Amino acid sequence: MPSYTVTVATGSQWFAGTDDYIYLSLIGSAGCSEKHLLDKAFYNDFERGGRDSYDVTVDEELGEIYLVKIEKRKYRLHDDWYLKYITLKTPHDYIEFPCYRWITGEGEIVLRDGCAKLARDDQIHILKQHRRKELETRQKQYRWMEWNPGFPLSIDAKCHKDLPRDIQFDSEKGVDFVLNYSKAMENLFINRFMHMFQSSWHDFADFEKIFVKISNTISERVKNHWQEDLMFGYQFLNGCNPVLIKRCTELPKKLPVTTEMVECSLERQLSLEQEVQEGNIFIVDYELLDGIDANKTDPCTHQFLAAPICLLYKNLANKIVPIAIQLNQTPGEKNPIFLPTDSKYDWLLAKIWVRSSDFHIHQTITHLLRTHLVSEVFGIAMYRQLPAVHPLFKLLVAHVRFTIAINTKAREQLNCEYGLFDKANATGGGGHVQMVQRAVQDLTYSSLCFPEAIKARGMDNTEDIPYYFYRDDGLLVWEAIQSFTTEVVSIYYEDDQVVEEDQELQDFVKDVYVYGMRGRKASGFPKSIKSREKLSEYLTVVIFTASAQHAAVNFGQYDWCSWIPNAPPTMRAPPPTAKGVVTIEQIVDTLPDRGRSCWHLGAVWALSQFQENELFLGMYPEEHFIEKPVKEAMIRFRKNLEAIVSVIAERNKNKKLPYYYLSPDRIPNSVAI
């Protein structure tokens, strides 16, 4: 009678173990075994983090083992069990069966061996059937739903507990936004201010009451230099929203600025038009905010938005500085162009309005839409169309870890009606919905391809714009990811025809296009992929967006937004319509009140924290791949990333403002916060 040694590994996360009865059946080319109870007398099996081995003897020869079936049956109380993997030592072989899934209730799961296979590689009926059934089950579990009209579709789940267990957080308490924000304010010693809505600060120094306990190197420098034009300009390159600035190739008619207005700022004895031709003028246009409804959820506090246009100049030191700001889109007598030569407080308030507008675009478009929602689309499509045995599922699953869960929690607590977002933000109460609906029309595939996005904004010349660290580091990380995906693609797809004939891949890409991009041709998202090169690029987009791009725009929020005047989440007075009337008192009364300041500070602190046991780029502790060539590619990937870490660390030495958001040792694998 054939005998097998079965080793079962239980996950190490909280509540991963089980006391339920676990049964195993083996399915082979010559037949199926009876189910065997995996149990040792006087031994606590399947404990959290444990590895348990069992000898299983079957009555008849099973032939080549294709599948392992695991069944969980109730002992006393039901407890979920997280199965990492099973290994099987046969008389002639050693087989690994990756799982990395939860088995809930009186559930069962059927596992294939860990060798990645395309659908064309499965010639055995039972394996084809298993592949088809897995996708049929997943497509019932992972359903598309419209969160808001015009948005990319999301997961069909009203709350976190409605999600499939495999994509829920290990501990829901750890991602409770209400609890985390309250904890943040308690830890930051600012909870005494959190209910003081409508109560203004006295002056800029008064903001230090909620700042001094929590400052760090960058936030301290922001506090000390936020009023300076150099600091203002620097943030467009290396702050937490470094994706808006672009080279100005033609002065827009809606910004009627002249050489005479800005000649004091121009250092090359050239006219403004000549500076434009020389490539020294840059622009940031917040047109998307024009006409967006401001938050009206608090009848006691009027809140306001603007849609500024900011003109910037590259001076002789190659630094970017502002030279003209118009606070709304339509030029006119009541919409003056503010200049550095205006009174101190006129110019300062104009810059504050730009910073506030930048905050809104950053939170809702750069961060929410272009990383969170896009990554959720990739994740849902992956689960619906790629079986666990598919090499691209094995590649991508680490990069959508907890993404659907964090977005569901955000819809449940943060971005919902009367949620936390409404408490402090001028775009709460529905404005953020309008913003996403507009921005989706400009969401393109090429804008997610990092090198193309940089080039499209005219920001690709490293000698011409030498201090754009977001660009420099991003390109290094992009190239490392693309090199890795190219290797993986070449292992499983020997030529372009194999790519084109992989129907599961094509269904994945089509799902993203149809449901994520709502079938919008102008998005430029492919409906199909027909070459290895394009597949590598597509996979790079998925991984880069979920990891590097999210890290670049998320984890600097506390650094750049904790000093409230530098990133006001709301403004309590409308933009000035004339020059020479702004006072310091007016600025302070325009800035957020104490309560909203505290909620904002708690938010940017909580959102800037890494998860406990964070997995950073290149870390793949779940061994979905078992083949040697892919494992070797992973090792090379990690070495490339380590080299980038060293390059960035060397550049940052002795810098007063180090840029480290795209250092791979600070880039989580996925959008999970």
UniProtKB/Swiss-Prot annotation:
Which residues are involved in binding Ca(2+) 2?
18-19, 44-45, 47
The record gives the membrane topology as: Peripheral membrane protein
Q: Which GO terms describe its cellular component?
A: cytoplasm; cytosol; dendrite; nuclear envelope; nuclear envelope lumen; nuclear matrix; nuclear membrane; nucleus
Q: Where does Ca(2+) 1 bind?
A: 17, 79-80
Which BP terms in the Gene Ontology apply to this protein?
arachidonate metabolic process; dendritic cell migration; glucose homeostasis; humoral immune response; inflammatory response; leukocyte chemotaxis involved in inflammatory response; leukocyte migration involved in inflammatory response; leukotriene A4 biosynthetic process
Q: Does the keyword Transcription regulation apply?
A: no
Catalyzed reactions: (5Z,8Z,11Z,14Z)-eicosatetraenoate + O2 = leukotriene A4 + H2O; 18-HEPE + O2 = (5S)-hydroperoxy-18-hydroxy-(7E,9E,11Z,14Z,16E)-eicosapentaenoate; (18R)-hydroxy-(5Z,8Z,11Z,14Z,16E)-eicosapentaenoate + O2 = (5S)-hydroperoxy-(18R)-hydroxy-(6E,8Z,11Z,14Z,16E)-eicosapentaenoate; (18S)-hydroxy-(5Z,8Z,11Z,14Z,16E)-eicosapentaenoate + O2 = (5S)-hydroperoxy-(18S)-hydroxy-(6E,8Z,11Z,14Z,16E)-eicosapentaenoate
User: Which residue ranges traverse the bilayer?
Assistant: none
- Site features described as Essential for stabilizing binding to COTL1, chain residue numbers: 103
After translation, the protein is modified as follows: Serine phosphorylation by MAPKAPK2 is stimulated by arachidonic acid. Phosphorylation on Ser-523 by PKA has an inhibitory effect. Phosphorylation on Ser-271 prevents export from the nucleus. Phosphorylation at Ser-523 is stimulated by 8-bromo-3',5'-cyclic AMP or prostaglandin E2.
Which Pfam families does the UniProt entry name for this protein? Lipoxygenase, PLAT
Q: What is its EC number?
A: 1.13.11.-, 1.13.11.34
Q: Which InterPro entries does this chain map to?
A: LipOase (IPR000907), LipOase_C (IPR013819), LipOase_C_sf (IPR036226), LipOase_CS (IPR020834), LipOase_Fe_BS (IPR020833), LipOase_mml (IPR001885), PLAT/LH2_dom (IPR001024), PLAT/LH2_dom_sf (IPR036392)
Query: What is its quaternary makeup?
Result: Homodimer. Interacts with ALOX5AP and LTC4S. Interacts with COTL1, the interaction is required for stability and efficient catalytic activity. Interacts with PIK3R1; this interaction bridges ALOX5 with CD40 after CD40 ligation in B cells and leads to the production of reactive oxygen species (ROS). Interacts (via PLAT domain) with DICER1 (via Dicer dsRNA-binding fold domain); this interaction enhances arachidonate 5-lipoxygenase activity and modifies the miRNA precursor processing activity of DICER1.
Q: Which family does it belong to?
A: Belongs to the lipoxygenase family.
Extract the PANTHER family matched here. LIPOXYGENASE
Q: What does this protein do?
A: Catalyzes the oxygenation of arachidonate to 5-hydroperoxyeicosatetraenoate (5-HPETE) followed by the dehydration to 5,6- epoxyeicosatetraenoate (Leukotriene A4/LTA4), the first two steps in the biosynthesis of leukotrienes, which are potent mediators of inflammation. Also catalyzes the oxygenation of arachidonate into 8-hydroperoxyicosatetraenoate (8-HPETE) and 12-hydroperoxyicosatetraenoate (12-HPETE). Displays lipoxin synthase activity being able to convert (15S)-HETE into a conjugate tetraene.
The name on file for this protein is Polyunsaturated fatty acid 5-lipoxygenase
Name the species this protein comes from. Rattus norvegicus (Rat)
